[in-house]
Amino acid sequence: KTAISPQIIHFSTHGYFIRQYQEENKKICDCGFDVKSTYFDSPNCGLILSGVNNNISYNTSSNSADDGILSAKEIMQLNLNNTELIVLSACNTGLGDIHSTEGVYGLGRAFKIAGVNKIIMTLWQVPDYQTMELITLFYNNLLIRKLCPRKALHEAQKTMRLKKYEPYYWAGFIIVE
């Protein structure tokens, strides 16, 4: 898996996170796929992309570079030093294993190691329609109003609040700088 380092990267997909104590052979994520935990690389989180059904439907591992899974381990090996912002419009992308003295090991850390400056991610499962609305507001604030990413997200969340959406629909999005 190779990537260039554009200024902004946006993923609108499914994220997964496997807790360390998760038993093998159980459903490992709330992304709709029932696969064995041994299939995934460590660290135990990533993004599910197109092509994943080709491997998961047979419940086998693939050594192919295009297996449909972008794991945190693979992300850490990318050079994204020129990427200012990555938006992870996917469930649970802000989760990870907590290490007492080192913080959270998850997608946020993986993208930081790869060189990304700012990361927008989620702390829980986010509903599709409201996520689309929030992200549309965010990009309007970022690209048209020329707000910085932190302010653009804050203003988008404020608009969702003014539209009387419950916090569940918008508060799960955070930015890590």
Task: Give the residues covered by each predicted segment.
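Catalytic cores of enzymes
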Residues: 1-177
